[in-house]
Amino acid sequence: MRLLTGFPGFLGTEFITRLLQQTDASFLVLVQEKFEELAKAQIALLEAGIPGATGRVRPVIGDITLPGLGLPAGFSLQGITEVDHFAAIYDLNVKESLARLVNIEGTRNVLDFARGLPDLRALHYVSTCYVSGRFGGTFLESDLEKGQVFNNFYESTKFEAERLVRARMKDGLPAVIYRPSIVVGDSRTGATRKYDGPYFVIQWLLRQGKSALLPRLGDPSKFTINLVPSNYVLDAMVRLSQQPSSIGQTFQLADPRPYTIGKIVDILARDCERSLIQIPLPKNFAKFAVSAVPGLEGWLGIPRGALDYFVHPTRYDTSETLRSLQGTGIECPDFSSYSKTLVEYMKENPGVRSKPLV
């Protein structure tokens, strides 16, 4: 039995889907009371779409921000062999208090819960590449505390949460850490439940005519942006989570060959069928304008927090991930090979949300 947090969120749901299809695993999914009906509907879809899935996913009302995960008195800890901790606040503009409550205290509560499980084999923790903050250079999978500064409270609280996980690992907790970079839709279908990252640029381009204006922050030939499709992240996690050699490891689920900002923008302009007119702007001026001019952030559709990633100084080493996935056929596809799919999905599905499920 596995206990999973972050249901019915996109990555958690898709992770369950793959394990139901590929293994005989069964799940307890921790669900906030306000999402109970949504979770039950999602479970019904899983059972209807996957042969043999009926009864293998059971919801339990709880909350990672509460001691003991808010589980009912007398909840049995027997038989839970793995914990999959997906739940987090992913919002670049999140307030510190909420980020700390969910990302740090929530993770602490999950770790305390896992420590009390008599049958635990592994805890699988979903972190982020951006625990790197604004580290200048190549950030290794073994790196964490490098004196970095952070763009926002999402990054800083995920950093603190990973510190907690690593401390428990040193004390003997069997755990695996996964660090996705910026996750976009499925490379084959474009499907996603949340638009952020490059989708802000796609949306901005599609709102304009054939000649589109786009602010240029910094040197677009100098900085890269690391994008990974959700199917790569999930396929990698499912495979790595079943390899005993993964215990104790950290895997950066990032594109090993990321494009520069300039190349990404050119690819998106091509796929949106727009010719670009780029206007150089200092990043700090752009952030000030978005913050200071009433309504500008909403009109642009680009959160001020996203602007930092147009001039992000960090590259991500993926050596351990590539070594562990060698021979499995699981590889990160080239962004240019699926970017058109992302654009078409967004055009056909304009109502997908851009806010986190909290």
Where are these regions (language model features)?
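NAD(P)H-binding glycine-rich loop region in Rossmannoid oxidoreductase-like domains
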Residues: 53-105, 115-116
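A hydrophobic C-terminal alpha-helical subdomain
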Residues: 204-221, 283-330
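N-terminal Rossmann NAD(P)H-binding glycine-rich loop of SDR-like oxidoreductase domains
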Residues: 1-24
